[in-house]
């Protein structure tokens, strides 16, 4: 229960291995949905088709034989909208409430379904009275799709935040550390859209929000809610969350790995508060992206490959590019046995990032660390810490 009249009817998915076919979710996922029980009954979003039958059972138990009046679709992504057509077929008096942009998307997902007379489009500032509850709609375009909206219930002071404030993990596996998987979720799902997240945070700042009901992860209240809003403000401004240095390396036969690990040792010996060393070939890419946003400094170390850079490093830097990654300091280590090329490629990709600084010197090693290379790493460490 969210409140006496707002019920949780969502489902956990413990069978899923990759969320959006790319993010590992060892703790599963939740697809959150809520029912507001008033003079008019509103269902807030549906669920992923993967768990459709469980969701239907939860809905029907909450309805207890009654008919819902409204289905509010905050977000058209299929993990939340898959059962819209089933709802409209099952409850002939039901109206679908969504943004105009969402209404345009309906035929993309439900070919041939007749939505005529069944859709109520709403925009920024519109309200929907359910009786004692009144929903006010808030535009949240590109957080993280263009049709997204949020809604605010003025009675119970609840913000239904769509994918905002979501996290990886099923609710049955929830821990007290909300930030860990919320951070990985935010930077990989919404990381590109910091400006849009800031716009929404400014819109809701004047509201008395006592509860946040996201589409993934736990309902937030009290201190966890305040902490989540503070983190979202930091994250969406692209500010480092904490001091630290990420060393991300791409090594073929181990030589680059040795150099990366050695740089980490040198940095720690010189007083670096936090140094994280990640093997891009074996680490969860989403977690490395998370760390890149979390800390102010990143070192990329990679082997040369086919006249360019080892592919996993290219993939990492490409991920940063598409997330509009800004305002960080970079160090570069390249490795090449006969014609080092990795540094040039990495340098070029980093130059394409907004307001990012490349720290000198760029370190070049030949196949394996030599005693003479130690001085290069020492110099780079000094520059990174200065």
Residue ranges, per PLM feature:
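Active-site neighborhood of phospho(di)ester-bond hydrolases with catalytic His/Asp-centered motifs
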Residues: 44-46, 68-76, 96-99, 159-163, ...
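Active-site metal-binding motif and surrounding structural segment of the metallo-beta-lactamase
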Residues: 50-97
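Active-site-proximal loop/helix segment associated with metal-binding centers of metalloenzymes
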Residues: 144, 148, 164-192, 235-241
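FMN-binding flavodoxin-like domain, especially the glycine-rich phosphate-binding loop
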Residues: 171-212, 216-219, 262-278, 288-386
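Terminal amphipathic helices with adjacent charged low-complexity linkers/tails
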Residues: 217-242
């Amino acid at each position: 229960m969210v409140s006496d009249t707002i019920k949780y009817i969502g489902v956990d998915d413990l069978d899923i291995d990759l969320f959006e076919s790319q993010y590992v979710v060892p703790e599963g996922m939740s697809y959150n949905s809520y029912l507001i029980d008033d003079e008019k009954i509103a269902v807030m979003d549906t669920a992923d088709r993967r768990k459709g039958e469980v969701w239907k059972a939860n809905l029907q138990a909450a309805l207890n034989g009654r008919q819902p009046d409204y289905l509010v679709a905050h977000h058209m992504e299929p993990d939340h909208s898959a059962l819209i057509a089933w709802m409209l077929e099952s409850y002939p008096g039901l109206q679908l409430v969504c943004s105009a942009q969402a209404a345009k998307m309906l035929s993309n997902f439900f070919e041939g379904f007749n939505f005529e007379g069944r859709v109520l489009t709403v925009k920024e500032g519109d309200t929907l009275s359910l009786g004692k509850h009144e929903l006010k709609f808030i535009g949240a375009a590109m957080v993280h799709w263009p049709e997204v909206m949020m809604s605010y219930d003025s009675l119970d002071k609840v913000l239904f935040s769509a994918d905002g404030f979501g996290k990886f993990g099923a609710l049955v596996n929830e821990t007290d550390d909300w930030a860990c998987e919320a951070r990985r979720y935010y930077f990989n799902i919404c990381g590109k859209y910091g400006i849009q997240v800031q716009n929404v945070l400014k819109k809701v700042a004047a509201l008395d929000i006592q509860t946040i009901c996201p589409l993934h992860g736990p309902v937030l209240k009290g201190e966890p809610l305040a902490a989540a809003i503070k983190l979202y403000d930091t994250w969406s401004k692209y500010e480092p969350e904490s001091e630290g240095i990420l060393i991300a390396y791409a090594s073929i036969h181990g030589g680059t790995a040795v150099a990366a690990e050695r740089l980490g040792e040198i940095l720690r010996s010189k007083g670096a508060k936090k140094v994280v060393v990640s093997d891009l070939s074996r680490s969860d890419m989403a977690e490395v992206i998370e760390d890149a946003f979390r800390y102010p400094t990143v070192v990329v170390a990679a082997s040369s490959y086919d006249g360019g850079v080892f592919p996993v490093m290219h993939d990492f830097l490409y991920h940063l590019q598409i997330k509009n990654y800004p305002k960080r300091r970079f160090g570069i280590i390249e490795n090449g046995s006969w014609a080092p090329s990795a540094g040039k490629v990495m340098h070029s990709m980093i130059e394409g990032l907004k307001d990012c600084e490349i720290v000198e010197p760029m370190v070049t090693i030949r196949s394996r660390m030599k005693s003479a290379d130690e001085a290069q790493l020492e110099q780079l460490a000094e520059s990174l810490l200065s």
